[in-house]
Design a protein with these regions (language model features):
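Extreme N-terminal starter segment of soluble prokaryotic enzymes
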Residues: 2-8
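Short polar catalytic/cofactor-binding loops
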Residues: 10-16
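Cys-nucleophile CN-hydrolase/nitrilase-fold catalytic domain and related Cys-dependent amidase chemistry
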Residues: 18, 26-102, 106-108, 174-197, ...
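Short amphipathic alpha-helices and their capping/turn segments at secondary-structure boundaries
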Residues: 23-37, 154-164
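CN hydrolase (nitrilase-like) catalytic-core segments centered on the catalytic cysteine
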Residues: 63-81, 152-242
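Active-site catalytic loop in hydrolytic enzyme cores
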Residues: 63-66, 88-193, 256-264
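Short beta-strand scaffold segments in enzyme catalytic cores
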Residues: 82-84, 95-99, 133, 224-226, ...
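A short C-terminal boundary segment appended to hydrolase-like catalytic domains
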Residues: 252-285
């Protein structure tokens, strides 16, 4: 696989209204398919809204829930990645990323780092994921998916990249932390720096899918993006407005970048493993 057409859906959603949000997903997926897309990606918790609080247990569903059948059916022709509240087989409730492809659905990532500070309180309502792993997609190749706060921990993209991800996708529901003033809000420039830095250091594509709109006291800022493996921004969606970015992933760029600068390929994983084990066991520090 050398190229893939990916639509990045920077959307708003209706809090705790699964049916309305599902219909919006289906509409955009159908439009993307007509536009020649191989895949479409939506933000964190795009099927439910973010600030569901105690309703999370009532909204949570197994990945094989019949209510998700419309996405499964559409996925015969287009890969769909979106955010939802997952009910595990053990009845854990997770902030998860779902992937629908070839008529099947699967949970591909459970959010690990649940922010519970300031305006955030995710640990009150969700269990933390316990696995960092890539997923193989027929249309997108080997990808690594993270959810918002996960990407503020360098260990997550580090492990995904070294498992072979040539595309790292982060689903976000990132709100403003203060009233916007002159220039870009700090949270916007921080995320731009994160995307550019990881893309460059790991020589991989980084796709950020953020939402927009207002929800309770939260204002989501959008600015979804695709960054190339040399750390250069390829496309950006606007601030605060819904938009579907139509992007092309040329995976030959990963090869060119890694051959030009081999810092990623030169990483000594055995050394890192040994040193981490020393820290964990208390032999260092």
């Amino acid at each position: 696989m050398l190229k893939a057409n990916l639509h990045i859906a920077q959307t708003d959603c209706t809090l705790a209204n699964f049916d309305e949000n599902l219909a919006h997903h289906c509409l955009l997926a159908e439009e993307a398919l007509k536009g020649g897309a191989d895949a479409i990606a939506f933000p964190e918790l795009s099927l439910t809204g973010y600030n569901v609080q105690d309703a999370a247990q009532d909204i949570a569903m197994h990945i094989d829930d019949p209510r998700l059948d419309p996405l499964r059916e559409l996925s015969r022709n287009i890969t769909i990645i979106c955010g939802g509240i997952e009910l595990s087989e053990e009845y854990g409730v997770y902030n998860s990323a779902f992937m629908f492809e070839d008529g099947k659905g699967r949970s591909i990532h459970r959010k690990i780092y649940l922010p519970t500070y300031g305006m955030f309180e995710e640990l009150r309502y969700f269990s933390a994921g316990q696995e960092i792993t890539v997923v193989d997609s027929r249309r997108l190749g080997r990808i690594g998916v993270a959810i918002c706060e996960d990407f503020w921990h360098v260990s997550v993209p580090y492990l995904l990249a070294h498992q072979g991800a040539q595309l790292m996708m982060v689903l976000m529901s990132s709100p403003l932390r203060m009233s916007p003033g002159a220039g870009l809000p700090p949270i916007v420039t921080q995320w731009q720096t994160i995307a550019s830095t990881y893309a460059f250091l790991f020589s991989t594509f980084v796709c950020c899918v953020n939402r927009v709109g207002n929800e309770d006291s939260f204002t989501y800022w959008g600015n979804s993006s695709l960054t190339g493996p040399d750390g250069t921004a390829i496309q950006n969606a606007p601030l605060f407005k819904e938009q579907v970015l139509e992007t092309v992933l040329d995976f030959s760029a990963v090869k060119r970048t890694r051959l030009h600068s081999s810092h990623f390929l030169d990483e000594d994983l055995r050394l890192i493993s040994t040193e981490l084990q020393s820290i964990i066991t208390g032999r260092k520090g």
